[in-house]
Amino acid sequence: MFDSNHEQELSKRRTFAIISHPDAGKTTITEKMLFFGKVIRVPGTIKGRGSGKYAKSDWMNIEKERGISITTSVMQFTYKNILMNLLDTPGHQDFSEDTYRILTAVDCCLVVIDAAKGIEERTRKLMDVARIHNTPIITFINKLDRDSRDPIEILDEIEKELKLHCIPISWPISCGKNFRGVYHIYDKIIHLYKSKFRKNFLTLDSFLDGSLNEYLGADLSIHIRQELELIMNVYSKFNKEKFLKGITTPIFFGSALGNFGIDHLLDSLIKWAPSPLYRQSNKRIIKPQERKFTGFIFKIQANMDLKHRDRIAFMRIVSGQYTKGMKLTHVRIKKNIIISDAFSFLAGERISINKAYPGDVIGLHNHGTIKIGDTFTQGEEIKFIGIPSFAPEIFRLIYLKNPLKQKQLKKGLVQLSEEGTVQVFRPILNNDLILGAIGILQFDVVIERLRIEYNIDAVYKKVNIVLARWINYGNHHSLYNLKKSYSSYLAYDISNSLIYLAPSSANLNIVMSQNSDISFNATREQ
């Protein structure tokens, strides 16, 4: 049954991801948001091995041991009567392509930047993916209570490297040990950081009439007035339409560890982030207001519960609404199934649900039939597009210490591959198993999970591969010629798509020039 309050449910939902480079403070921000959403009572920080205290969003065993985020957690909380669907992506330098795919399931991104370091490598790569969909970006410049770069310098870097026009919403009053707070340009309020006075904020009147000297001192008061005058003359005013098109980014400053500025971010998500957006299918645009249910799978996690050895498929609802016990069509395999046990998430915890709406992320039990990119509908034969696989950047040959466990190894690798941890390739000329990943840590994750979850001891050998490109060919004669000349470089991935594994960029360029009627692609649609 379709709710009459469907539009209202849409208007009070925000689905967003937090992305950053390692150690920019993303997990601390996540926890503080959960604190504001009253999901956790006391915000904590990630602790090292043996401390026994870990971030709420870091629930996998290896994450707890190493004190880093290497998977993607989905969390739902309410803030000021708005339902927030937060997808917490790994912040560690070496994460999987699963992180990239998460960005296809959100309507907005919060980018966290370390004020001392500015734009870093992983932030650039994640922004390249976000830009494919023109995802709206809100930027938080963190750690102002530590030694920092000049704020204007950071904004210049954002505009140059991320190709976003910066719109400062708040502005810092000094930094490091002298950090006194921020001036909210649009609310015209000065928020004081760890004020020695009873007031936590000052109105614009006190900013103008000189009484600010009492709180900041005469020299700093004069400096911040001059700086703000410059900022408000140089940078444009906030325009929501340009923000929603991914042209501009509102800028906030603060300290997540000091619990300062997080409420400003949440308020901006409520005011400016879009409610659930439409998605493109292979046949038409699907709007969230439509009555019929549609959704797509963007992530699979194997063995979230070791006691049950289960596999969970994460589905983003696009249109209609989920109701417990409803019948859905699994389009790829053309099979109707009844969904009676979907649930929502709080990190590793599951909460059974009776209803869910567009923008929500729900979990489905998966017995091996659901794959990343699968579409579910109420009968319509469509497929959502824009959920790609990305070519790995690092490669290893994996083999067993005990060759008798080859069957278990293949099963474990299939599951880990289907959830996006690594990609598995089978050379067409031999029985080797080659793994490909975005970051080196993923290989450690695979070895650890094979040992803990499948009781398999495996090791790696280096392999002479530096690039991978999926092959699309127009006719079988072209493919025959390629296989005839370069069969030793060809392999199949887990979906039996042909891929070229190049030992060097020069080799790839030569092969491409000799086979101009074949396309070599860095991404593959699921």
Curated annotation (Swiss-Prot):
SUPFAM superfamilies per the UniProt record, alphabetical: EF-G C-terminal domain-like, P-loop containing nucleoside triphosphate hydrolases, Translation proteins
All copies of domain tr-type G, residue ranges: 11-277
Keyword Cytoplasm attached: yes
Annotated compartments: Cytoplasm
GO cellular component: a single term: cytosol
Keywords, in A-Z order: Cytoplasm, GTP-binding, Nucleotide-binding, Protein biosynthesis
Chief location bin: cytoplasm
CDD domains reported for this sequence: RF3, RF3_III
Annotated binding of GTP, by residue: 20-27, 88-92, 142-145
Gene3D superfamilies for the chain: P-loop containing nucleotide triphosphate hydrolases, Peptide chain release factor 3, domain III, Translation factors
Gene Ontology molecular function, alphabetical: GTP binding; GTPase activity; guanosine tetraphosphate binding; translation release factor activity, codon nonspecific; translation release factor activity, codon specific
One Gene Ontology term from the biological process aspect of the record: regulation of translational termination
Any Pfam family the entry gives: EF-G_D2
Matching InterPro entries: EF-G-like_DII (IPR053905), EFG_III/V (IPR035647), G_TR_CS (IPR031157), P-loop_NTPase (IPR027417), PrfC (IPR004548), RF3_C (IPR032090), RF3_dom_3_sf (IPR038467), RF3_GTP-bd (IPR041732)
Chloroplast is among the record's keywords: no
Function: Increases the formation of ribosomal termination complexes and stimulates activities of RF-1 and RF-2. It binds guanine nucleotides and has strong preference for UGA stop codons. It may interact directly with the ribosome. The stimulation of RF-1 and RF-2 is significantly reduced by GTP and GDP, but not by GMP.
Family assignment from sequence similarity: Belongs to the TRAFAC class translation factor GTPase superfamily. Classic translation factor GTPase family. PrfC subfamily.
Listed name of the protein: Peptide chain release factor 3
Species, as recorded: Buchnera aphidicola subsp. Acyrthosiphon pisum (strain APS) (Acyrthosiphon pisum symbiotic bacterium)
Gene designation per UniProt: prfC
